[in-house]
Amino acid sequence: WPAWPRGPIQAVIHSRVDRGDYTVEKVYFSSLAGHYVTGSLYRPKADRPTSKRRPGILCPHGHWPEGRFYDAGTDKAAEQLKRGAEMFEAGARYPLQARMVQLARMGCVVFHYDMVGYADSRALPHRSGFGDVGAVLRLQNLMGLQTFNSIRALDFLESLPDVDRKRIAVTGASGGGTQTFMLCALDTRPSVAFPAVMVSTGMQGGCVCENCCFLRTGINNITIAALFAPRPMALSGANDWTIDIETKGLPELKAVYGFYGKADLIDAKCYPRFGHNYNQVSRELMYSWMNRHLKLGGKEPIRERDFKPIVPGDLKVFDVEHPQPRDAMTLEQYRVFQTRLIEGQYAKLLSGARKGLKEYRRVVGSAARVLLAGTPSTGYSASGIARGKLSGGGTFETGTVTRTGLGHAIPWTLLTPAKGPGPSLVAWFDGLGKAALFDEQGKPIPAVRRLLDAGHSVLSADVYLTGELTRDGKPVTRVDTHGSFVGYTYGYNLPPLTHRIRDVLTVVSAFTTKLSAAVNGGQGGRIGVHLVGTGGAGTWVVLARAVMSRGRASRGVTIADVGGFSFSKITRRDDPMLLPGALKYGGLGGLAALAAPSVLVLGGTEGVPKSELSPLRRIYDVADGELSIKAGSISADSVAFMILGR
């Protein structure tokens, strides 16, 4: 996000093999400038020339050894024949080719394309190259590239003169099943889908090509597959993680399809006597599904026929006469290309902001809702509340607050002036937690006391991994992540920074509602909220304000000391401040700019790169917002002075 540019396909189709009732051709085309998709194109061969367009089927393969070139060998083939998984030796030894051949014989144009790092697609590796912090901060990953390749494979299929664009289907197994339902969730062109032995409530995908940051936080593959509704989709299961698909997954999918009155257009069948597979038994289930929903007119039941396979060496796309293009990028070149691409996209957003902020807020704001978990609240509950009097005047309350649907409790403290709640709330967060607002005797620090005496309520909390939510009360400097690929961690779990921002939003929203009712008696609108972040909490607070503002000026000032922090300084995958995608959207300043035109004082910026501050200045200038950027740190006394001076 935003989408990558889709340039000319420039497809090369060569070396036609005629098998009598179908043909096979070799294909490569440009997915991105300097990155190529390779594969085999299967076409039905008509008895006589026809102008009739045929259904097109896209077939991604999974993690079979050598992918499109897969040869099970004689021993495994014999085992498959013995177990009844296959009827013919050719299908048992070359099950991927068997699928393409049968679909072509049924009247479909079939494109069987390579995953990155398999068969002819060897310019980039499959399981490495995107695990470093730089890739994480820019959301560069193999999942994104392969999904884009699938979109481009659809572009290629649609470009063929003999393909009916209204009858496009996708089917693949295992990792190819992942590519199938991911593509079908994102692209509206496929009309039929059959992801085999992948969709389940269990394991969600074990390869880096099936995972990326933020992909499955709070959801699973059932949810993603449901995005295809109400178009026809069928699933197959086996004696693997998909074994329960008929009872765990299918009922939920039928419920979603039922919203459209189309529960009959989703189905699943498990064959528990077979291990992980896309064997003839499962393939014939798929053939029937395609026959019915692509309106192929075949006589049921459809049985796969024997065929003459092409030896893997003869499937190779690149040869002496058709060498790999000279501009094919290496991994290092691709990474540079990708970085320049996203930098160019962001620069275009900044440049366009001179004419208005609508597009900037649409693109970066949409990203921020994912990165910063800025979803609307659905309610709150408080518990363990204790009350008492403050030395020097006023009262305190302590307790925990829980956001509906999240479960974890956030410890908080609310200090109220002697005369009761006033028209504004100071929500002050610190890296040490709420304890930072009190001295060693448990009294409010002088800055907090001045705010109370001036009629401001003061709120603080121990957000994620701070204060009471740590083992020893000390700041957490390292968090556990997967050793080589954080997509396995942050694809399912929110980063600590995002948790902290969401906790800030939860606490502020809950008490803004509570105090607004207390001050206004339920009438006259909400109170003003000043947000303060010190002691390492400045980044959490300014990004929380970015989520809260939504293009509107807040009724309070935001004072955030970032302590020299910038996302470009992060070097470790276990850094609790690591936010995947941050540098793709302008870093600290690019995301914080969403707070405009709310009044913002950003301190502790000494050492923060210009590249992460200039977007903030640019957007605030266009929004005509009040922005003050200070190199030095912001003291507690300065916080009180700035709030009381307004």
Task: Indicate where each model-derived feature is located.
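Alpha/beta-hydrolase-fold serine-hydrolase catalytic core, especially in secreted/extracellular enzymes
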Residues: 1-36, 47, 52, 236-424, ...
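Cap/lid segment of the alpha/beta-hydrolase catalytic domain
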Residues: 48-154, 158-159, 198-211, 421-514, ...
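Structural recognition of the beta-strand scaffold that forms the well-ordered cores
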Residues: 56-59, 110-112, 169, 192-195, ...
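Accessory cap/linker subdomain of secreted extracellular hydrolases
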Residues: 78-80, 85-89, 93-100, 105, ...
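Short acidic capping loops at alpha-helix termini that bridge into adjacent secondary structure
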Residues: 79, 165-167, 264
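Alpha-helix capping and helix-loop boundary segments enriched in small/acidic/polar residues
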Residues: 87-94, 134-148, 170-181, 211-224, ...
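Primarily recognizes the serine-hydrolase "nucleophile elbow" in alpha/beta-hydrolase
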Residues: 155-217, 507-594
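Catalytic-domain carbohydrate-binding cleft regions of carbohydrate-active enzymes
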Residues: 171-176, 180-196, 202-210, 214, ...
